[in-house]
A protein has these predicted regions:
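C-terminal alpha-helical "lid/dimerization" subdomain adjacent to the S-adenosyl-L-methionine
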Residues: 327-374, 379
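Short acidic-aromatic active-site loops that bind/stabilize oxyanions
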Residues: 65, 203, 356-360
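N-terminal accessory segments
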Residues: 1-186, 226-232, 375, 385-387, ...
Length: 397
């Protein structure tokens, strides 16, 4: 069976790849890298036979499965540490595993370039091998596979049972259906310490390799220039996890006056090792009144996408009560879904939010409705370079 595109179409796609690669090579901008990647993927899709494409999709879960097994077997760590050719028997010996099983895992890993093959049953580290020794990368694989995959497999059944309605409510979603629980993920996770640790570590690196908002958002112009140097608090990281984002802000602006406050649940704050001299820890519940009043910046990254519109209305209303009109800024770092030609990464995150939290990512119009309904006005949507999270700058009406 032939591909479904003509030679002329393939030539056009090849030209698009060449042009986008040229732009990336000359500018080295994130937006050009993403454009080149999309063009290359369109060419790959065009060359793929439709039936083969279906088979690749159907069998693709084996990729993540073998990566997850390889983490348990220390395959990535061993290849990286040896920094040279390693035989199949040597890799199997690390965990006293069956060489036949290890070879089956390695066939997939070599096929997706997560491991190199330099001779028959002899392997070597690649860039992706080394990446999978990074604690943040390991945690995202563990969390998505161990917590997300069992639920993902149940989503079609869950939706059939709910007449294919978009689910709502933090305790009545796919996770609750799959795990047979009646509590939110945030109540359930602390009962599973290993999964909770994977989640919290994953959240430290949830931007992936995409640039921090501090690198492209005009922080000094939009936030610091209007800050009152005599004000008690400069920035509150609302539900900020272990404090990695607040630490990045402090590293970039070490001399800014005012308190820097990290807020989260007590069991999360206990895991934080941030600079105790400048970063204060404040135990906090999103659904209770905001304890820090009149700060210049209230920063929320990947918080509101964890909750439904109804729950977010309650969260934002509590926050609004602590903000100073005309002075305080709400800075939301989240994906902003495009109305068309959207990037794949935010679309995949959107489904993960349903799987884990029974929530969603949002478009500009959706964000605007949500914020205005809680007493805010959107000042500006700031688009990121590439396909990462944007910044929503908002104030009280």
């Amino acid at each position: 069976m032939a591909t479904t595109v003509s030679d002329e179409s393939i030539d056009q796609l090849q030209n698009q790849v060449t042009e986008s690669l040229g732009a990336f090579r000359s500018q080295r901008e994130e937006i050009d890298r993403v454009a080149a990647l999309k063009a290359a993927q369109r060419l790959v899709n065009a060359l793929q036979k439709p039936q083969d494409s279906v088979y690749h999709l159907a069998y693709s879960p084996t990729h993540a499965m073998c990566v997850r097994i390889a983490i348990d077997m220390d395959i990535f760590a061993t290849l990286t540490e040896r920094n040279g050719p390693v035989s199949l028997d040597e890799l199997a010996a690390v965990k006293k595993a069956s060489p036949i099983l290890v070879e089956r895992v390695l066939r997939i890993l070599v096929g997706i370039d997560y491991v190199g093959e330099c001779d028959t049953r002899v392997y070597i580290a690649t860039t992706m091998t080394r990446q999978l020794t990074d604690r943040l990368s390991i945690s995202v694989i563990k969390f998505i596979f161990d917590v997300g995959m069992p639920t993902l497999a149940k989503v079609p059944e869950f939706l059939r049972g709910h007449d294919h309605r978009n689910p709502e409510g933090a305790t009545t979603g796919p996770l609750q259906f799959a795990e047979k629980i009646d509590e939110s993920i945030w109540t359930w996770l602390p009962q599973n310490p290993e999964k909770l640790d994977s989640c919290n570590t994953f959240m430290e690196g949830d931007r992936g390799a995409r640039p921090s908002w501090l690198e492209w958002f005009p922080v000094e112009e939009r936030l610091l220039c209007g800050a009152n140097p005599d004000a008690e608090t400069l920035m509150v990281d609302v539900a900020g996890g272990r404090g990695h984002d607040l630490a990045a802000f402090l590293a970039r602006y070490p001399d800014v006056p005012g308190r820097l406050v990290l807020e989260d649940l007590p069991h999360v704050l206990e895991e934080s090792t941030m600079d105790a001299e400048r970063i204060e820890k404040q135990a906090f519940d999103l659904f209770k009144p905001q304890p820090i009043h009149g700060a210049r910046i209230y920063y929320m990254k990947f918080i509101l996408h964890d909750w439904s519109d109804e729950e977010n209305h309650a969260i934002l209303t509590q926050l609004a009560g602590a903000m100073e009109q005309g002075y305080s800024k709400l800075i939301i770092e989240e994906f902003v879904l495009a109305d068309r030609d959207g990037a794949m990464l935010p679309a995949m995150w959107d489904w993960e939010m349903m799987i884990f939290c029974n929530s969603m990512e949002r478009s500009k119009s959706h964000w605007t409705r949500l914020l205005e309904g809680a007493g805010f006005q959107v000042i500006k949507f700031w688009a990121p370079p590439g396909d990462g999270q944007g910044i929503i700058e908002a104030e009280l009406k």
